[in-house]
Amino acid sequence: MLSKAHAKVNLSLDVIGKRKDGYHLLKMLMQTIDLYDLIEIKKIKKGIIIDCDREYIPKDRRNLAYKAAELFLDRYNIDSGVRIDITKNIPVAAGLAGGSTDAATVLKIMRDIFRPDISNEELKEIALDIGADVPFCIEGGTALCEGIGEKITPIKNFKNQILVLVKPNFGLSTKDVYNNLKVEKIYIHPNTTKLIQSIEEDNLKSVARNMRNVLENVTLRKYKALNSIKSNFIELGALGSMMSGSGPSVFGLFDDMLKAQICYDNMKEKYKEVFITRTI
């Protein structure tokens, strides 16, 4: 069984506190985009086998797709195993939920193969044990995600909007970015309510104005290239630009495909991983 695993971007990301167990409390507006990996799963007698077209992708428990399959098989006492073939298009360690969406897609395919009676809500319970972005990736679309990612409120779909996406030539560790964030020193928070209102009113310029990611407090200081990319997007006609997730991917929001194409061509001269895509 073959399925697409779509990436996401953050239209906003706020950190509003930290729990005693070390988990950060988040308030994020998440958006699925039409950039995707392909996941194919076949039933086998025993075990979990992962194959991928990129050699650097781990094929053991370090891969969230493996972890998803293992949790599913254990939870439902399934005796057989699975072979998972992954075709990677989403950049890794990029803030685009590449690993999380693969894991979510594995859960959904395995449900179809083994337990079609399972609801999305039940799948999300498993998903939360894998990572904060995985529950959102079960549903996709446009949603407000709160807590540690488990509280998901769908909002009006912000679909068919044009994005140009740049993944710089380095990766970032989500854990390191959050560890270096000082919550008490976040002085400007996203106006998430205003952002949602702007989406509901189809006010693209207001959406662009209200996009904000507090993790940029960490990454923009350390990686000057991210500032340059954001500035380049605005110079090349983007309505707004923001880092997605814990980075380092940066996207520009456009209202014109010609401007987006010119921007893409310009960015492609400097960076290997550049994409034109749309929200879905």
Swiss-Prot record:
ATP binds at residues 91-101. Pathway: Isoprenoid biosynthesis; isopentenyl diphosphate biosynthesis via DXP pathway; isopentenyl diphosphate from 1-deoxy-D-xylulose 5-phosphate: step 3/6. GO terms for biological process: isopentenyl diphosphate biosynthetic process, methylerythritol 4-phosphate pathway; terpenoid biosynthetic process. Its EC number is 2.7.1.148. It is an enzyme of class 2 (transferase). The active site is at residues 8, 133. GO terms for molecular function: 4-(cytidine 5'-diphospho)-2-C-methyl-D-erythritol kinase activity; ATP binding. It holds the Pfam family GHMP_kinases_C. Keywords: ATP-binding, Isoprene biosynthesis, Kinase, Nucleotide-binding, Transferase. It catalyses: 4-CDP-2-C-methyl-D-erythritol + ATP = 4-CDP-2-C-methyl-D-erythritol 2-phosphate + ADP + H(+). InterPro entries: GHMP_kinase_C_dom (IPR013750), GHMP_kinase_C_sf (IPR036554), GHMP_kinase_N_dom (IPR006204), IspE (IPR004424), Ribosomal_Su5_D2-typ_SF (IPR020568), Ribsml_uS5_D2-typ_fold_subgr (IPR014721). Belongs to the GHMP kinase family. IspE subfamily. HAMAP family: IspE (MF_00061). Catalyzes the phosphorylation of the position 2 hydroxy group of 4-diphosphocytidyl-2C-methyl-D-erythritol. This is 4-diphosphocytidyl-2-C-methyl-D-erythritol kinase. The gene is ispE.
